[in-house]
Amino acid sequence: NRGTKATVFACHVPHPERFGVIEFDRNFRASSIEEKPKNPKSSYVTVGLYFYPGDVVERARQLVPSTRGELEITDLNNQYLREGKISVVPMRRGNIWLDAGTPASLMEASMFISLVEQRQGVKVACIEEVAYRMEFIDDEQMMNLIREMKAGTSYRDYLEKVYKERY
């Protein structure tokens, strides 16, 4: 379906009126998507992670600004919804989405990431590590990335540790 359908990720939140809200039917299929509604129809919201088919650029070019004066991603998602070309994937228990849309939520997200990294000794969302562990890059490519970084930085030191752990 990834070639023809849009995929939207969703999360249950306590204050959905601040986000794009997704309403579901009995079979847990999206029935509506509404941007920052005063009276949300559900507590599930889009988390800002989307996969789109190849026609997305042309569709985006045709969007018109909303009453708020913005091009709304919700309008794009609603095009796919009306055509039955959207899948909504709810985030499962154990996954976390961190809102960073207000100064307070950005601070909370930063503190959470810092705590996880300190307590577990791992980096969160280290793209080089993810690419290496998933074998999108090989040993030589990983070492080239490491060598390009300034020596003695904690990030480079971390990647060197990741590289050495593999052997």
Q: Over which residues does each language-model region extend?
A:
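Unchanged
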Residues: 1-167
